[in-house]
A protein has these predicted regions:
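The feature captures the beta-strand-to-loop junction immediately N-terminal to the Walker
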Residues: 61-63
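A short, surface-exposed alpha-helical micro-motif characterized by mixed small hydrophobic
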Residues: 212-214
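H-loop/switch region of ABC-family ATPase nucleotide-binding domains
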Residues: 206-207
Length: 225
């Protein structure tokens, strides 16, 4: 059995703006008829290569707009690369955007089960993990609050707790560890150390270099793709 968890080979990702997919069919037809139709394209990532073995942690760094989040979306299967191939061996829990996978009008309790279900876990498993998730997120007093009533730090804590405590094969975090107060950042960093020692493969996008150096076994630097 292969020990490779993620293999990214010559991956390039192109965005196209101005076509009917991005502006809508009606606007596309109007622009075509009036001669005001231009298609622009840019490459968010170009010829990206990396290989990550099980139990390793990759840190992805780079300035804003360098293509970090786009690459993560391709690794998780949210979007397909324009060129190249990505092979993933294992289940993925991903925190790509704050609040993604949650319903603003549902309670913290309901959202915990919803998010867990989206990650593929059973009600029985989530029943067993629920109290631990809420304790780690420090949201014991907010279980019946609507998600939209939480602060950004609370939302991040809940998302991180669910992803880390359901034991995925691969954990992908986009700037999540930088949200929240200092005490929770330390606690989440300690949890990441525990996760890696337990054999989980992880990818972390972060602007905090000391955090990347401390946690990651490999680093990928992206510079405008």
């Amino acid at each position: 059995m292969s020990n490779i968890a993620i293999e990214c080979s010559n991956v390039s990702i192109r965005y196209v703006t101005g076509d009917f997919k991005s502006i809508g069919l009606k606007e596309y037809v109007i622009r075509k008829l009036t001669g005001n139709y231009k298609v622009k394209e840019f490459w968010a990532d170009q010829n990206v290569n990396f290989e990550l073995e099980k139990g390793e942690m990759l840190g992805i760094i780079g300035s804003n707009g360098a293509g970090k989040s786009t690459l993560l979306k391709a690794v998780t299967g949210i979007m397909l690369p324009t060129e190249g191939e990505i092979h993933v061996n294992g289940t993925i829990a991903a925190l790509l955007e704050l609040g993604s996978g949650f319903d603003n009008d549902m309670t913290v309790r309901e959202n915990t089960y919803l998010r867990g279900a989206l990650l593929g876990y059973t009600r029985k498993f989530l029943d067993e993990k629920y109290d631990e998730i809420i304790r780690f997120a420090e949201l014991e007093e907010f279980q019946d609050y609507c998600f939209k009533q939480l602060s950004s730090g609370m939302k991040s804590r809940l998302a991180f707790s669910i992803a880390c405590l359901v034991h995925p094969d691969i954990l992908i975090l986009d700037e999540v560890l930088s949200v929240g107060d200092g005490a929770f950042r330390k606690k989440s960093g300690d949890k990441m150390q525990e996760i890696i020692q337990g054999g989980v493969t992880a990818i972390l996008v972060s602007h905090v270099m000391p955090q990347v150096r401390e946690l990651c076994t490999k680093i990928l630097w992206l510079d405008h793709g």
